[in-house]
A protein has these predicted regions:
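N-terminal, intrinsically disordered, small/polar-rich Type III/flagellar export signal
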Residues: 3-114, 118
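Detector for methionine-enriched segments
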Residues: 1, 49, 81, 128, ...
Length: 400
């Protein structure tokens, strides 16, 4: 397959046409800047791997080189999906060389137990990245806006922000009793797609001036990530045979949006919002964290039914006038609510709601304009990241 790509000549679409029914199927579609469309397909047919390659036009030497490098990412993505537990491995396909490639599309279908199918779809072009996962356990999606990289930070800053978000995802799946395998795929997709930074250090930004050139202080007050939206939703299950309306569910949404506007760079306004929402329902043994045993009899109808409704938000606002920072603020809120209904022999015995909320408000003007802020850039930046647990927001407020 790689030799055919390296040859560079056009390959008819009907070459090595695949049968309609295959066990596992993987496709990679590439559109070059010259307009050529290249499609690679690998499929498992009765235990034998076969392939199909097609190109709409001849490729030049640079295009062939780029496609050969992408083929390595294609193989890595395939290896991830065909492991013991399907995994998302897309980093090799996110390295889009805009000089030669317009867009990349990847699709995977992997057969699972009981005639189920796990799918992964990925798209990348000059303005966006998108990955979606679907299977018997549920679905997940990650969208990243790369139409402007003006507020994207350094690679190191993005790594810190991603690590912070991954910790939030772990807390959410634990609190909501979500599917850990599905969450792992979600985390992998989130991590791979959100690494959009090009700069190694902040000095690199000075070599690429733009209309909304951000100052060092601006970047300290922002996450460094490109704007994104991501969600994960677990397939509802009815674990209690006597009450099939009591579903076990898990849904989590998280996003970031950034606006940079104004009449000029000297009078710019920057606003960045991060938010998350967790909704989950699940059964446990009374007073415990493990699942109850149900066999359809009344004697096993002793359990707690939990309903989780959490949200978090972080807002940063920076206002400049005549080139000077006049206002800078941080507002963060974390709210958690858990309703616990206790049933004994199928009858409701107690119904309690445990709410918790904390807020943090800080004026960032002094930290961002003082000489000491140079020393504390990293510390200040780490306090910008979203927190979903009220207790953690309290701890942040005591240190910040």
């Amino acid at each position: 397959m790689l030799k055919q790509l390296g040859a560079g000549s056009a390959i008819p679409a009907e070459h090595a046409r695949l049968p309609d029914e295959v066990d596992n199927k993987f496709t990679l579609g590439i559109t070059t800047q010259s307009g050529a469309r290249v499609d690679l397909t690998l499929a498992d047919v009765d235990g034998e791997m076969i392939y199909q390659v097609s190109s709409s036009d001849e490729l030049d030497e640079d295009e062939r080189k780029v496609l050969s490098e992408l083929a390595k990412g294609f193989q890595a993505a395939i290896n991830g999906m065909t492991g013991t537990s399907p995994a998302v491995r897309l980093s090799g396909l996110t390295q889009l060389d805009g000089k030669f490639v317009q867009s990349i599309d990847f699709h995977a279908e992997v057969a699972g137990p009981d005639s189920t199918t796990q799918t992964l779809d990925f798209h990348i072009d000059q303005t966006m990245r998108k990955a979606s996962v679907a299977g018997p356990d549920g679905s997940a999606e990650v969208n990243v806006d790369t139409s402007t990289l003006e507020h994207a930070g350094t690679k190191q800053q993005q790594s810190k922000a991603i690590s912070s978000y991954l910790a939030q995802f772990d807390q959410a799946v634990s609190r909501g009793h979500g599917d850990k395998k599905l969450m792992t795929m979600f985390k992998d997709a989130f991590s791979d797609l959100n690494r959009t930074a090009i700069a190694e250090s902040r000095e690199d930004f000075l070599t690429k001036p733009s209309k909304w050139q951000l100052s060092s202080g601006d970047r300290t007050a922002l996450t460094g990530l490109s704007d994104f939206s991501a969600s994960i939703s677990q397939t509802p299950k009815s674990s209690n045979p006597r009450k099939d309306w009591e579903k076990d569910t898990f849904a989590y949404d998280v996003s970031q949006s950034t606006k940079i506007e104004g009449t000029s760079h000297e009078d710019r306004k920057i606003a960045q919002s991060q938010q998350s929402q967790l909704s989950a329902k699940f059964h446990t043994e009374i007073g415990k964290s493990g699942p109850p045993f149900f066999d359809g009899t009344l004697e096993t109808q002793n359990y707690d039914y939990h309903q989780i409704d959490d949200s978090a938000r972080s807002d940063v606002a920076l206002n400049y006038r005549l080139g000077k920072l006049k206002k800078a603020s941080l507002q963060q809120v974390a709210s958690q609510s858990e309703q616990v209904q206790t049933f004994i022999l199928g009858k409701l015995k107690s119904d309690k709601i445990n709410p918790s909320q904390q807020a943090l408000v800080r004026d960032l003007l002094a930290p961002l304009t003082s000489y000491e802020s140079i020393k504390g850039e990293d510390t200040l930046n780490e306090n910008i990241f979203l927190l979903g647990v009220p207790g953690e927001l309290v701890a942040r407020g005591q240190q910040f």
